[in-house]
């Protein structure tokens, strides 16, 4: 039977009626939810011409939750009036009543009460009239009794303004008998089973029409991984600071752009196979800007631009070796080289957030593939002070305000600084980034003007994400062992939104 007992009741009531039934009135008579009757109507409609149902919309007035309370207990102003004894009541005490603030204002405008500000113990409230009529309660009781039409438009408007009354649209069905009306309806099949097909019984069974407009179950999708959430926050911060995103689609990079262009010598330990993934095929880069390559070679082997260089035999074959980039600073080098070819020079602010690769032993805190965040600013006369100022602005936007700087060494920056922040959870200072001013030996061979300085800084994406989501093992954040439920449940993350002052001890 379509929709079970409710549909049966509907058909029996419809058989006994002369013209038809209103679904809302039927629900009230049967003492059930209107939606249950509507469901039965729609189920019977699916059977064909058993019934006819006309959708009707009617407007009516209903009391809000506050309006229901006032209809029972009286208006706020009436309650305030009744609470004032003949000798008056201190205004401060009156305001502490649940209806005090609203009721006092309305009672004053109705001229039911007055305030004597000359009283010794402070302003005191007295009655002005001996009695009053609570018109608000009376009007609301009329609405509750189904007599809202007795109220004028002005009275209804006043009640709506006080959010005591609401106009609602009630959608009901007027149900009448159809051309194929019957009180005994056979059950319609909703599934075609293998047994029906093999026996041929499907030919004699009625099937429920397929509803192509029905909404199916929405697929469980749209959950952002914690790394993507934090990455979006970093990216938004850079954009708010006026930075432009660099192209970082070169996962495979030549040793020239990854190392040599950064004034990193060819015998540096970082270029060893134990730290870098070198490619077997294609093993070498075929296209390099040879005029720039020659300037880099001369700087490495002979010096120049105020530098003695490294005094070794620089080899082009070594620079051609392809690898998986170990940092996104190679993308910064490419961007700065393109900038140097544009005349005249224009100050820029670049950033990038992308993956890098290191030949490291995998453990709870290290991966062979991770994300690097990098910011670069190029302008005339930039100094270490500018770098520290930009770093403070950047990390403050992250919610990290307690910063310390420690001198460090990088092959391609001088001076260089490590950035530390006090971590409340670990109760100690932790490194959150590295920074520095790019060396002239890196910038001048590109063709940048001598009075142009470039400040830069970088940090990983995984470390702050692990800290903020309370993850101790990086393999729980990235990789095939990640619990997808963690991705579904993870909330939006704000980095140290309410930082606290750190202790006074120096960073280690």
Curated annotation (Swiss-Prot):
Pfam families: PheRS_DBD1, PheRS_DBD2, PheRS_DBD3, tRNA-synt_2d
Co-factor requirement: Mg(2+)
GO biological process, one term: protein heterotetramerization
Reaction(s) the record says it catalyses: tRNA(Phe) + L-phenylalanine + ATP = L-phenylalanyl-tRNA(Phe) + AMP + diphosphate + H(+)
EC number: 6.1.1.20
Residues that span the membrane, as ranges: none
CDD domains named among the record's database cross-references: PheRS_alpha_core
Compartments in which it is found: Cytoplasm
SUPFAM superfamilies the record matches: Class II aaRS and biotin synthetases (SSF55681), Winged helix' DNA-binding domain (SSF46785)
GO MF annotation terms: ATP binding; magnesium ion binding; phenylalanine-tRNA ligase activity; tRNA binding
Positions of post-translational Phosphothreonine modification: 190
Main location group: cytoplasm
GO cellular component: cytoplasm; cytosol; phenylalanine-tRNA ligase complex
Residues holding L-phenylalanine: 329, 372-374, 412, 438
UniProt-annotated binding residues for Mg(2+): 414
Modified residues (Phosphoserine): 193, 301
List of residues that carry N-acetylalanine: 2
Keywords per UniProt: Acetylation, Aminoacyl-tRNA synthetase, ATP-binding, Cytoplasm, Ligase, Magnesium, Metal-binding, Nucleotide-binding, Phosphoprotein, Protein biosynthesis
Residue positions, PTM N6-acetyllysine: 311
Family: Belongs to the class-II aminoacyl-tRNA synthetase family. Phe-tRNA synthetase alpha subunit type 2 subfamily.
Subunit structure: Heterotetramer; dimer of two heterodimers formed by FARSA and FARSB.
Protein name: Phenylalanine--tRNA ligase alpha subunit
Organism field: Pongo abelii
Lineage: Eukaryota, Metazoa, Chordata, Craniata, Vertebrata
Gene: FARSA
